[in-house]
Amino acid sequence: MLTVRATRPSDLAACLDIVHGRYAFSDGDERAALAYWNHLLESRAGLSRVLTTLAGPDEGRILVFALCVFVTDDFMREALTTLPPHLGLQAVRRWRSGKRVHLALREIARDNAGDGLNLLTLAYGTAPGLPRDVDLQARAMMAAAGRDMFSGYRIKNLVQEGLGTELHADLLATGVKVLRSFPTHAPVDPCRRNGPPTHVYGLNRDGRPEDLGPHWWMFFNPPEPRLGLSEAEKETLERALENETDDDMARSLGISIWTVKKRWQNVYSKVEQVAPALLSAVGNADETGGASGFERRRHLLAYVRQHLEEIRPREVLRR
């Protein structure tokens, strides 16, 4: 049994073991990678998922790790033109030297409401030696998780690097293009002078809509959010989608259970103003419990799963 969940800081050492060697990390690079990845998770600037086992002798083992980040225009421009292979390694080294690589949360909100975002897969790895059927299931589940991670953001460039033949056929089959290629014997890194052929894959918003296809079009052209939620209300819904209870939220956020309940009441009030039909079929019980309260929440979360733009960071533009 396998499941996909949000990556936790405590997962990162195991995640590094999975990708070790793919990016020619030195010992110093490894320490910097752990620090950088932890910073991205703690600051909510990174999007990350792990696929783990749910049962059996390896219960809890991480089989797949993915970490994505919204990078600056300058870093994306270099990634597509002049940076050497191993973009995840180059990002770690840039960050370690004090240079800007990624956008902070407030900048993500600004660009998500404006010109759009540059999404780069910073690290991706699969545990070696997986049986063929497990490997295929894991890849399918992570692809679905990726759609959930990216949906609702206004993306202008989407880029992922692949080494050798790993994921090559999968990516091309979805319509992703090869943007750069490095030959087999390119001097990829001082730590490892020769390596497998490397490709940089991606899509950008400037192409023709028909070139994107239905699989990708919504990532570049998300609907406008309608509910007008505050950042605190968005966080409440996001955590609920991750199956956190109200008590879980109160503990993890360091707020009272009353504050959590108040957030839900504010959300319902906004929904009733904008889309009253969404909740009218399940009554008006308050959120303190009961069948109607449970059904109202279930209906609301079902809507949000289909409209993740409602909970993405987004600056309110002044007109």
Q: At which residue positions do the language-model features occur?
A:
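Short helix-to-turn junction characteristic of helix-turn-helix DNA-binding domains
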Residues: 237-244, 304
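Recognition helix of helix-turn-helix DNA-binding domains
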Residues: 245-295
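Conserved GNAT-family N-acetyltransferase fold
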Residues: 64-68, 124
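Active-site rim helix/loop that mediates acceptor-substrate recognition in acyltransferases
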Residues: 27-59, 67
